[in-house]
Swiss-Prot record:
It comes from Clostridium perfringens (strain 13 / Type A). The keyword Hydrolase does not apply. This is Small ribosomal subunit protein uS5. Residues 10-73 form the S5 DRBM domain. GO terms for biological process: translation.
Length: 165
């Protein structure tokens, strides 16, 4: 199910900008690549990349791409329902629930994703690559795979009490 970005009040955050080079016969062609995260701080977050000769244009393309890749995040209160591993390439991020008042404890790129997803109390640990693109995509992968007890109960056709035990 695709999420319509026009109905959401999205905020964007540029995670990284890098200069990339294409070597051709006549010399080097320089461009800028931007990694952008968008979210409504209410359970929706997406990541996108843009590339252009100028930085603002690369960021704009990244925002457009991120709006096409929105995912819904299960949030329980101000944290995640359970611990989860997110993986993408060599990026490996462990996302853990935290008690209220803890805040967002996460490194660089993962922090941007968690804040824009609307999580207020959560801990995250990067266990794999610290490449921003892999870290961001691993975090999004983990958040997309979160399920609340209600979701699981509905899928199994049971009550929440039967699931929790």
């Amino acid at each position: 199910m695709r999420i319509d970005p026009s109905t959401l009040d999205l905020k964007e955050k540029v995670v990284s900008i890098s200069r990339v080079t294409k070597v051709v016969k006549g010399g080097r062609n320089f461009r800028f690549s931007a990694l952008v995260v968008v979210g409504d701080e209410n359970g929706h977050v997406g990541v996108g990349t843009g590339k252009s000769i100028e930085i603002p244009e690369a960021i704009r393309k990244g925002i457009e791409d991120a709006k096409k890749n929105l995912v819904e995040v299960s949030i329980v209160g101000t944290t995640v329902p359970h611990e989860i591993h997110g993986k993408f390439g060599t990026g490996d991020v462990l996302i853990m629930p935290a008690t209220e008042g803890t805040g967002v404890i996460a490194g660089g790129p993962a922090r941007s994703v968690l804040e824009l997803a609307g999580l207020k109390d959560v801990r995250a640990k990067s266990l794999g690559s610290n490449n921003p693109r892999n870290m961001v995509k691993a975090t999004i992968n983990g958040l997309a795979n979160l399920r609340t007890a209600e979701d699981i109960a509905k899928l199994r056709g049971k009550s929440v009490e039967e699931i929790i035990g």
